[in-house]
Amino acid sequence: MNRGIEEIVGSTTEQLIEVGPLKWFYREVQPTQQTDKSPIVFLHGIPSQSLTWREMMPQVAEWGWRAIAPDWIGHGFSSKPERFQFAYTPDAYRTALEGFLAALEIEQFSLVVQGFLGTVGLQFALAHRDRIERLVILNAPLSPTAKLPWKMKQWGIPLAGEMLTQDPLLVDRTLEGGSGFRIPDEYLDIYRKPFLQTSEAGRALLATTRNLNLAKAMAEIEAGFADWTQPTAIFWGGADPWLDGEAAKKLASSRPNIDFYPFPEAKHYPQEHWSEEIGKDLVEFLRRQN
């Protein structure tokens, strides 16, 4: 294991840590005062990266939580191994996440997940529920009816997907199309950068998309939530063009430990444009007594 700080941006540190053959990039915000609160781990969806949590992480740190947001392997600025080195399956991602958490000596924590790759975070939480203090979900698939939208599904098509995933503007079209609002160029430049630096970024996105196995993941998640007891909050962008919020509402209404926070105008990536509003509710949820 090898760990080093690359750069400090405001109160957010950008770091790299080597876990076996994998190199994880992650952002971290330390609380202004030391507390005994367990950390919060933020997991992004596709084709995003940890930058998507740039505003929410300082919000929770201000209230005493250490916030950590990694770039998934194959995404953002983490390593992008070839498929014979890393399978890009949910199981491979869960194993890799376990290694990342162990390297940072994180045992008990709260988990925040978003988007289609967020399903891996949900699968991890359901398999390690004794380690999860609180779970927070933002616009992630939650029922067997959830499907990968065509905009993403086409990334996994032979030949066509190989061309599409090499286009850096794919990031602009997906993040802005999914969120419904313009994302400032200063952030789009960072989101695009991995695709401009190496063709490995596109190949990793293609492999991730092909191997999501959403149907199997949804079956596991639906079964797992049947007896889920940890405090949970669902923050939902009601205008999501790709996911139906009814499944999220139904899940929340079926469990007394799950709260539902609607944001009617927000879409698939609500944290991009509603981070202040979501952050306030998130802090209130985290501070609430069980």
Q: Residues of each region from the PLM?
A:
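Flexible "cap/lid" loop of the alpha/beta hydrolase fold
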Residues: 126, 133-163
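Active-site loop/oxyanion-hole signature of alpha/beta-hydrolase fold enzymes
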Residues: 20, 27-30, 62, 69-113, ...
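Conserved serine/cysteine hydrolase catalytic core
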Residues: 201-253, 262
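Glycine-rich nucleophile elbow surrounding the catalytic serine of serine-hydrolase chemistry
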Residues: 114-123
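Conserved alpha/beta-hydrolase catalytic His-Asp/Glu region
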Residues: 148, 165-226
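Conserved HGGG/HGGXW glycine-rich cap/lid loop of the alpha/beta-hydrolase fold
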Residues: 29-77
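N-terminal cap/lid segment of alpha/beta-hydrolase-fold proteins
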Residues: 4-23
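Catalytic active-site module of serine/aspartate enzymes centered on a nucleophile-bearing elbow/loop
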Residues: 258-290
